[in-house]
Regions:
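A broad helix-preferring feature
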Residues: 1-2, 56
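Bacterial Sec-dependent N-terminal signal peptides
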Residues: 2-29, 137-148
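Short, P/G- and charge-enriched loop/turn segments at secondary-structure junctions
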Residues: 10-13, 45-47, 81
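Short, solvent-exposed loop/hinge segments that bridge or flank secondary-structure elements
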Residues: 20, 27-64
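Short beta-strand element of the conserved SAM-dependent methyltransferase core
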Residues: 30, 58-60, 110-111, 131, ...
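Contiguous, well-ordered beta-strand patches that form the walls/edges
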Residues: 37-40, 61-136
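Short loop/turn segments at connectors of secondary-structure elements within structured domains
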Residues: 54, 103-105, 140
């Protein structure tokens, strides 16, 4: 099922066409499948920061300047997950890079100990690669899915 997204927040520049999310959520809390092609149109990754709200999924990227940013609304949604049975667990996200041609994705991104500055992925060897490193200008900015 394709889920249309609506733009919730933007800063600067021209507005690209509205993207579609190709995420297909399973009932299992932490599992998802996705199509790593055509996740976002090209304009989405140019000069701007956007937050898109979709049914069951949240997207955010930075503006490819190397600056870490997470929208407060998205942060609040994430922190709501750190309750109840999952209070001591790592929050997991799926993510994908434009082009799907990275050793880091598609895959799972983790939120470490409720610290909004500690998002990371693990490579095949188990090394933690933190999102602030992934978001340098020499990387394609990733697209994150909050798995609900």
């Amino acid at each position: 099922m394709l889920t249309a997204c609506t733009k919730e927040n933007e800063t600067g520049g021209n507005t690209p066409s509205t993207p579609e999310a190709h995420g297909r959520l399973y009932n299992t809390r932490w599992q998802t499948t996705y199509d790593d092609h055509s996740i976002m149109d090209e304009g989405y990754y140019q000069d701007h920061y956007y937050v898109y709200r979709c049914t069951d999924v949240i997207h955010f990227t930075n503006n490819n300047s190397g600056t870490r940013h997470i929208d407060k609304e998205v942060y609040d949604l994430i922190t709501q997950e750190v309750t109840g049975e999952h209070a001591d667990s790592t929050i997991r996200f799926t993510y994908v890079y434009k082009g799907g041609d990275s050793q880091y994705g598609p895959g799972v991104i983790y939120w470490e100990n409720g610290d909004s500055n500690k998002f990371y992925v693990q490579n095949i060897g188990g090394e933690r690669i933190y999102v602030e490193d992934l978001e340098r200008p020499d990387y394609n900015p990733p697209c994150f899915y909050l798995v609900q």
